[in-house]
Amino acid sequence: MSDKVNHPSHYTWLKEKCGIEVIDITRHMDFDLGNAIKYILRAGHKSEEGYDAREKQIEDLRKAIWYINDEINNLLK
């Protein structure tokens, strides 16, 4: 069983494949880019009761787009 607080499975799947957790990548990035990468990497790996898996994946990708757009808007200021 995964540790839902310290090592949730929707973030640690990458460790099983590559030996690195999502946080090991995103902690070195600014907030918007780190969150965009986080949502991209967890897309398709997080399930939530009451949500269709495809709907959850789309939601995560939309969140990533939001953070990318926010980063672009900050750079344009």
What are these regions (language model features)?
Residues 1-77:
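Intrinsically disordered, low-complexity regulatory regions
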